[in-house]
Amino acid sequence: ARNFEPDTIVLMNVLEHLAEPIASLKVLSSIAGPSCKLLIVVPAIQALYNRMDSEAGHYLRYNRKLLIKHHIEAGWNVVDARYFNFPGIFGWVLAGYLSESNKSESALNAKSTNWMIRVYDKLFIGLSSFTDCFTPRMAGLSLCCVSTKSSSNHS
C-alpha cells in the first residue's frame, strides 16, 4: 500500500475553529510529503472578535505573530504571512455593532449583515486589491500564511 503524502495542503478558515491548532498542524506535518507546502487563511485581529465570530464557532482571530508561532511550534517553516482585505475591517466592525443592537436574530443570518456583504462585494473588492499592496504587514480582516515542511520533519 502506498502512503498518502500530499504536496500541498490548503486550510481556508479552518484553524480558528480548532481547540488545539498546534496539535492539528503537527498532524498535517506528519502526513505531508517532504516538499509539502501549507497554505492557511484565518480571520485576523483579535480586537475584531465579535458575536459573528462566536456564532461561527471561532475560538480566536489571529495576529501575524501568533500564526507564525503556531506554525513554527508545529514544525513548519514560514515562507510568508500577510494580512489582506484592509477595507473589510470597517465592514466587520459595523456588522458586529449592528448585530449587538439586534440580538433577536442570528448575527450571521441578519438581513443587515447580508446586505452589507452584497454592498462590500460590489463596491469595495477593487479597493481591497489596491490597499492590500500597502498593508500586508500591518492589518487586514484576514491573514494568509504559506509554509513548507521543516527539513527536520522529513521522513
Model-inferred region functions:
Residues 47-50, 87-91:
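Short catalytic/ligand-binding loop motif for oxyanion handling, primarily in non-cytosolic enzymes
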Residues 76-87:
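Conserved S-adenosyl-L-methionine
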Residues 2, 88-155:
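A C-terminal cap/extension of S-adenosyl-L-methionine-dependent methyltransferases
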